[in-house]
Structure formats: C-alpha cells, structure tokens
C-alpha cells in the first residue's frame, strides 16, 4: 500500500510517521508514505498557492495549477493508473470503518489536504474520486484527517499489527463498540475489576464482553446499535 499526501504542511506528518506502528509498517515495507509539498509545484515566482475567490467572499481559495501539477507528478513518477484521489473536506461523506476496510485493499491512495477556504472546484471535477469528512466539525486543514485515514487503513493491512486477530476485536466489529478493559491492580481507589473477568471461565467472559459491547453501543451510538440488530 502506498499513501501519497498532497499538502502545504509536510512537516506535520514527519513526527507521526516516525513513531510506533506506522514506523514499523514502513520499515517492514508493508506501507509507503510519500509526502509532496504542493507549494513546490507552483509556477508562481513567489510560490503562491492561493487567490481571492471569484464572486467575492471571505478567505482565500487554493489555486488549481499547483495541485494539478502535484497530482500529475505523483501518477507519472509512480506509474499509477485510475488512482483513488481523496479530498479531505467537511462537505464529504463521513468516514467510517467500512470505508477504511474498502480502502485497505487498494494499492495506491492519494490524499489531498485542503486549506484556507478550500480548493478550486475544477480540481474536484478533474482528479478527485472521493470527498471525505471525518466528522461534523471544521478543522484548519486536511492534514489531521489524512493522518486519521492513514492510521485506520494501515492497521487493517496484514502484517501491520503484531497480532492478526487484534484489530478484529476492536470497536465497530459487527457494528458494536468495544467492551471495557481492565488490568492490575484488582482494586484501584475502591473500584474493583468485575469478578467474571477473574473467574477463568472464558465462556462467561465472552458473554460479559458481548453484553457490555451491546450496552455501551446502545447508550452511546444508537445508530450502530440499530444496525447490529438488523443482522
């Protein structure tokens, strides 16, 4: 899997990609992360990448030329045909685990991080295949959403996690949120670990975890709870 990130702030990605799971995945050659500074591809002598919007309005809009030339460089350099180009925007479809699973099967994903008031619509018409949002709130740019997508997709790729089964137990499996976790000590500040988890009875432990997943999902994400009952 190769991730290609188009951004105005490449330094945001460096520290994250040099830590923990992502670092190991890159070192193993399971994933590649290529970062491109859109400003480097601007044909403006001052490397300007934004301009005032036609029709007026607040803020600036990212101009199409630097983005388009960055895109052409990526697909030419890496010989990519029919690429998935994802624009991170509040206007997009809300990202979820099902989308992450679908994307984990791809060979190349290009992530376009917007900034300012957004990007020229013609870029969306020309190269963008999907517009994706990570939630109903506004961020300064697309860099944090891009990191979220890279992390959530990468952990679904075989070999990235230490134990293949570990991601299958996590939240959103079967549309249920994850059950509570406990570790030592057994009693902390008067709060005790549920006795069933200390019983050694794996059947009862599994039942408790299932019941807790259902309870938590019903309380916090009723939309997912309804989906789980439809199966």
From Swiss-Prot:
Record-listed E.C. numbers: 2.1.1.228
Pfam families in the record: tRNA_m1G_MT
Localization (cell): Cytoplasm
EC class: transferase
Keywords linked to the UniProt accession: Cytoplasm, Methyltransferase, S-adenosyl-L-methionine, Transferase, tRNA processing
MF terms (GO), sorted A to Z: tRNA (guanine(37)-N1)-methyltransferase activity
PANTHER family: TRNA (GUANINE-N(1)-)-METHYLTRANSFERASE (PTHR46417:SF1)
HAMAP family per UniProt: TrmD (MF_00605)
Record family assignment: Belongs to the RNA methyltransferase TrmD family.
Protein's recorded name: tRNA (guanine-N(1)-)-methyltransferase
Species of provenance: Clostridioides difficile (strain 630) (Peptoclostridium difficile)
Lineage of the organism: Bacteria, Bacillati, Bacillota, Clostridia, Peptostreptococcales
């Amino acid at each position: 899997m190769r991730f290609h990130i188009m951004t105005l702030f490449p330094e945001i990605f460096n520290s994250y990609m040099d830590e923990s799971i992502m670092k190991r995945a890159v070192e193993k050659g399971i994933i590649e992360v290529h970062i491109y500074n859109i400003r480097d591809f601007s044909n403006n002598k001052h490397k300007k990448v934004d301009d005032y919007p036609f029709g007026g309005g607040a803020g600036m809009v990212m101009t199409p030329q630097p983005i388009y030339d960055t895109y052409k460089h990526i697909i030419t350099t890496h010989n990519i045909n029919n690429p998935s180009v994802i624009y991170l925007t509040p206007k997009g479809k809300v990202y979820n685990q099902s989308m992450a699973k679908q994307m984990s099967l791809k060979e190349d994903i290009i992530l376009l991080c917007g900034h300012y008031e957004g990007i020229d619509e013609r870029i969306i018409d020309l190269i963008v295949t999907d517009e994706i949002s990570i939630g109903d709130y506004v961020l300064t740019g697309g860099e944090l959403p891009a990191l979220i997508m890279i992390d959530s997709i990468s952990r679904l790729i075989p070999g990235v996690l230490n134990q293949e089964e570990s991601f299958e137990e996590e939240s959103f499996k079967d549309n249920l949120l994850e059950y509570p976790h406990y570790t030592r000590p057994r009693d902390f500040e008067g709060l005790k670990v549920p006795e069933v988890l200390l019983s050694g009875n794996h059947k009862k432990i599994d039942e408790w975890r299932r019941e807790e997943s259902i309870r938590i999902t019903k309380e916090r994400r009723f939309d997912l709870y309804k989906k789980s009952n439809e199966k």
